[in-house]
UniProtKB/Swiss-Prot annotation:
Originating species: Rattus norvegicus (Rat)
This protein's name: Histone-arginine methyltransferase CARM1
Gene Ontology CC annotations of this record: cytoplasm; cytosol; nuclear replication fork; nucleoplasm; nucleus; protein-containing complex; RNA polymerase II transcription regulator complex
SAM-dependent MTase PRMT-type domain residues: 147-454
Modified residues (Dimethylated arginine): 551
Residues found modified as Phosphoserine: 217
Keyword line: Chromatin regulator, Chromosome, Cytoplasm, Isopeptide bond, Methylation, Methyltransferase, mRNA processing, mRNA splicing, Nucleus, Phosphoprotein, S-adenosyl-L-methionine, Transcription, Transcription regulation, Transferase, Ubl conjugation
Disordered: annotated span: 581-617
Enzyme class at the top of the EC tree: transferase
Gene this chain is encoded by: Carm1
Length: 651
């Protein structure tokens, strides 16, 4: 897909004009490059003849579907050279900023004013000459239908908005770039898959001298508008096209991108990110620098029963008189092939996670075609293992500091959520047992992966496996608080509700023994545990989201504070006080689905819009409700389905 091939890049990019020679249609786009020079070379009669135009010329390129019309004009608007360049035309790049075209016995050498001008011209010409018909690295690994859907999806401003509004994602990127400003000051930067160009603007804020922003979807046109409106055309150059197919005029000092999908690898944009290293200087850096995929066994009887219950529709012996039961087995297989995208209570995990690391500075594209992750879990709890949970962290390792972006279930929720892969046959394991096996991801041409998981309890020999399609996930997130696993209370919740303080004075002056002086009902919802369920994604038209506990980019390194090692969240047994997090929302193949189906930003019809319960089907107000009992107003962590935003007791 050459999404923006008709959009010229560089100084003097013109507008649509009349048809040029060589098949450029009546609506062909005209690109103008001033300051070009022309040298004519021939060898008639066996002697080399040269003729150079003494003055700088204006080069106009009329881009058509099969050819490009090229014309050079003098200052007096006299055409001194004109030709058509198609797929059959003999032509080639010369040096950094020149191009040679051979017509019969003569050749013309066109020298551009800057390498940037030549790069823009060359990228336009490749598309016009039908180079999109050639099999680039991207085309070899991607079905055309998948690529069309993918780039169409990311060409929508609404999807760019969704990603930009992920506070954790966008804020962490900006913090990582600005905190490591020395890695960007006066440097050349490449932004792979720039989208709206937001990361390029961050690089400019950090002092980058030149940023090449490559974008294959039609979003490149919008990015160009933003660059111009922010007066950064001298520093940010938007290059329409795929990074596998465009050309850059120079090597770069650092590559930035946001290439992560569900389970880190979905959408296969990481391969484009690694491909871009052909433009990276030997001492260059990449932001992000490394990626860690974490996986851990989980127990969730409710989720498991949900999938089986859906498949039981096909168990009916008489659906409008038709026996559907022959398809019940196929339905079970299909539902269990879907990775589940949502979030969960940390207490469903049964062992410390296993980590698989990809160093983007060292990895090659081929390394991501087949990813094998062996695992051996030492079980911390007894129960049924229903599958494996996945999440990822990426690190921006700069000269000044390392900043982490995490999608862990203990951190503020992002539009990547977490992903869970179910077993059709759960495994029973006891605390102290080991669960070993392999997770194998095989890349497919649908910009995703086929997942094969095999797991075995070593002590009993019981084994389970499953095949899953990462391209077809089940988006389960509803905006409600994830439920803790059954049996999470080790003291009486009812007693804890009243035994959390000394005396509570109602506004009427009545003193109730055993009640606290400032009682927060959110502690009741937590069930006596210190797990604070603040990991909701705000639905449409909700109140202000409280990000007090999730400062952007504040995860400097996993399990390390200011250089001193501390026990990370997965060291040893899982403490009952592990917290969950704050908020956010999304849609396809990460979506950034980088396409697929999307999660609506409004509460699904018929589902509760209230955290932790409430029967309302409308979108809830996340943190606006105030609850008072004769004292100061208490902010409710859990929204309630009430007609007003304030409740008062004893008034």
């Amino acid at each position: 897909m050459a999404a923006a091939a008709a959009t010229a890049v560089g100084p003097g990019a013109g507008s649509a004009g009349v048809a040029g020679p060589g098949g450029a249609g009546p609506c062909a786009t005209v690109s103008v490059f001033p300051g070009a020079r022309l040298l004519t070379i021939g060898d008639a009669n066996g002697e080399i003849q040269r003729h150079a135009e003494q003055q700088a010329l204006r080069l106009e390129v009329r881009a058509g579907p099969d050819a490009a019309g090229i014309a050079l004009y003098s200052h007096e608007d006299v055409c001194v050279f004109k030709c058509s360049v198609s797929r059959e035309t003999e032509c080639s790049r010369v040096g950094r900023q020149s191009f040679i075209i051979t017509l019969g016995c003569n050749s013309v050498l066109i020298q551009f004013a800057t390498p940037h001008d030549f790069c823009s011209f060359y990228n336009i010409l490749k598309t016009c000459r039908g180079h999109t018909l050639e099999r680039s690295v991207f085309s070899e690994r991607t079905e055309e239908s998948s690529a069309v859907q993918y780039f169409q999806f990311y060409g929508y401003l609404s999807q760019q908005q969704n990603m930009m509004q992920d506070y954790v994602r966008t804020g962490t990127y900006q913090r990582a770039i600005l905190q490591n400003h020395t890695d960007f000051k006066d440097k050349i930067v490449l932004d792979v898959g720039c989208g709206s160009g937001i990361l390029s603007f961050f690089a400019a804020q950090a002092g980058a001298r030149k940023i090449y922003a490559v974008e294959a979807s039609t979003m490149a046109q919008h990015a160009e508008v933003l660059v111009k409106s922010n007066n950064l055309t001298d520093r940010i150059v938007v290059i329409p096209g795929k990074v596998e197919e465009v050309s850059l005029p120079e090597q770069v000092d650092i590559i930035i991108s946001e290439p992560m999908g569900y389970m880190l690898f979905n959408e296969r944009m990481l391969e484009s990110y690694l491909h871009a290293k052909k433009y990276l200087k030997p001492s260059g850096n990449m932001f992000p620098t490394i990626g860690d995929v974490h996986l851990a066994p989980f127990t969730d009887e409710q989720l498991y029963m949900e999938q089986f219950t859906k498949a039981n529709f096909w168990y009916q012996p008489s659906f409008h008189g038709v026996d559907l039961s022959a398809l019940r087995g196929a339905a079970v297989d299909e539902y269990f092939r879907q990775p589940v995208v949502d979030t969960f209570d940390i207490r469903i995990l049964m062992a410390k996670s296993v980590k698989y690391t990809v160093n983007f500075l060292e990895a090659k594209e081929g390394d991501l075609h087949r990813i094998e992750i062996p695992f051996k879990f030492h079980m911390l709890h007894s129960g049924l293992v229903h599958g494996l949970a996945f999440w990822f962290d990426v690190a921006f390792i700069g000269s000044i500091m390392t900043v982490w972006l995490s999608t862990a279930p203990t951190e503020p929720l992002t539009h990547w959520y977490q992903v869970r892969c179910l077993f059709q046959s759960p495994l029973f394991a006891k605390a102290g047992d080991t669960l070993s096996g392999t997770c194998l991801l095989i890349a497919n041409k649908r910009q995703s992966y086929d997942i094969s998981i095999v797991a075995q309890v070593d002590q009993t020999g019981s084994k389970s496996s499953n095949l899953l399609d990462l391209k077809n996930p089940f988006f389960r997130y509803t905006g409600t608080t994830p439920s803790p696993p059954p049996g999470s209370h080790y003291t009486s919740p009812s007693e804890n509700m009243w035994n959390t303080g000394s005396t509570y004075n109602l506004s009427s002056g009545v003193a109730v023994a055993g009640m606290p002086t400032a009682y927060d009902l959110s502690s009741v919802i937590a069930g006596g545990s210190s797990v604070g369920h603040n990991n909701l994604i705000p639905l449409a038209n909700t109140g202000i989201v409280n990000h007090t506990h999730s400062r952007m980019g504040s995860i400097m390194s996993t399990g390390i504070v200011q250089g001193n090692r501390v026990a990370g969240p997965w060291a040893g047994d899982l403490p009952p006080g592990l917290r969950t997090r704050s908020s956010y929302q999304w849609g396809p193949g990460r979506l950034r689905g980088h396409a697929g189906s999307s999660v609506p930003m409004t509460c699904p019809t018929g589902s509760s819009g209230a955290q932790g319960g409430g029967g309302s089907s409308s979108a809830h107000y996340a943190v606006n409700n105030q609850f008072t009992m004769g004292g100061p107003a208490i902010s409710m962590a859990s929204p309630m389905s009430i007609p007003t935003n304030t409740m008062h007791y004893g008034s």
